[in-house]
Amino acid sequence: MMLDKDSVKAIDVQTASLQSYISSPEKQKSLYKRTLFVVSISQIFGGAGLAAGVTVGALIAQQMLGTDAFAGLPSALFTLGSAGSALIVGRLSQRYGRRTGLSAGFMIGGLGAIGVIMAAIINSIFLLFISLLIYGAGTATNLQARYAGTDLANHKQRATAVSITMVFTTFGAVAGPSLVNVMGDFALSIGVPSLAGPFILAAAAYMLAGVVLFIMLRPDPLVIARTIEAANEEPGDKGHLAATEHTENKKGIIVGATVMVLTQIVMVAIMTMTPVHMRHHGHDLGAVGLVIGFHIGAMYLPSLVTGVLVDRLGRTAMAISSGTTLLLAGVIAAFAPGESMILLVIALSLLGLGWNFGLISGTALIVDSTDTATRAKTQGTVDVLIALSGAAGGALSGMIVAGSSYLALSLIGGILSLLLIPVVVWSRGR
C-alpha cells in the first residue's frame, strides 16, 4: 500500500518525536511528571465511578427481585466483569499503548453504567446483570491505571508513582458515596428510579476518565518506555545471561502476584463479614459505616508514605510488613469483644494498612520484574488473579462464619497472611 506525502510526513514527525525522548533525560522526566498528573486526574473520576455504583448495586437487585437471596449477585457480576476486563485492558495496552487500553476500559465501564440505568427504567433484571458485568470494566481499569505512572519511573520512583495514583483514587471513592442522596434526587427529577442515580454519576465519571486519558495521555508513556528500552539494548551474548534474567523475572512476577493475591483474599474475607459480625452484636448502621470508613481510609490514605518506604526500604521489607500487619489485624479482630468499637476500628484499620503495604510492594515487584515488551499483558493477567481472589475471599468468608465463627475467620486470615514471609524469603534465594 502506497502512502501519500502527508502520511509519510506524519510518520516522520512521530518518529522524530519518539527519538527526541531517547537522548533527553529532561524530556523523559517531564513526561513522567505529566503522565502522573494525567493518570491522577483520571483516577479521581474513576474512583467516583467505582464507589458510586458499588454503593447501591445490591439494593437495585433487591428491589427488582423482591428478595435478599440474590442481593450479592451484583458484586459477583462486576467482579467477574473486572477479571475479564483486566485481561482485555492489559492486552490492548500492550499492543496499542496505555492511552488506548485505559481509555477504552473506562468508556466500556461507562456504557455498563448506562445499561444499569436503562435496566432500572424498564425493570429488566436480565439487562441489569449483563450491564453490571460490563460495568466491571471500569473497576479493572481503575486498578490497572496505577501501572501507567510507573512506565517512565526509575527503580527508586516506581512505588511512589503507584502510591500517588492511589491517593487520588481516594478522593473520588470518598466523593462518590457522599453524593448518593443527591444523585437519587436528581434521578427522580428526570423520571429515573432513585437507586439508579449513583449509576448516572458512575457513567459520567467513567466517561470523563476515559476522555481525559484519550486526549491528554500523549505521548503514550508505555510506547516511549518501549522506544527508550529498545534504543538502550546492547548487542552481545544473550544466551546464559538472558536465561538467568528470565528466571529471575519469572520469580519476581510470582512473588509480586502472590503478595497481592494473598493480601486481597485476607482483606476481603475479614472486611466482608465484619459488618455482619457487628450487626449481630447490636451495632447500628452508623457504627458499621464508621468502622468501614476507617478501613477504607487506611487502604488508600497512607499510600504516599508507603510508596516512599517501599522505594527506600525495599519491596521485600514492606511485603513482610504487610504479612505481619495483617496477622495483627486478624488477631485483634478475632479476640476483640463484639461490643468494642475501638478495637474493631483498630483491627479494620490495620487490615486496610496491611493491604496497602501488600498492593504497593507487590505492584513494584511486578514492574521491576517485567520489561516493556510484556509488561502490560503480564500486569493485566495478575490483576485477573487479584479480582478472582477477592471474589473467592468474599464467598469463602460467609461459609467459614456460617460453619464456625468470625473469630475462626479472622484467625485463619491472619495465619494465611504469614505465608507471605516464606514466599518473599524464597524470592531472595538464587
Swiss-Prot record:
It comes from the Bacteria. It is a multi-pass membrane protein. InterPro entries: MFS, MFS_dom, MFS_trans_sf. It is found in: Cell membrane. Keywords: Cell membrane, Membrane, Transmembrane, Transmembrane helix, Transport. GO terms for molecular function: transmembrane transporter activity. PROSITE patterns: MFS. The chain crosses the membrane at residues 36-56, 69-89, 100-122, 126-148, 160-180, 197-217, 253-273, 285-305, 317-337, 340-360, 384-404, 406-426. GO terms for cellular component: plasma membrane. Belongs to the major facilitator superfamily. This is Uncharacterized MFS-type transporter YdeG. The gene is ydeG.
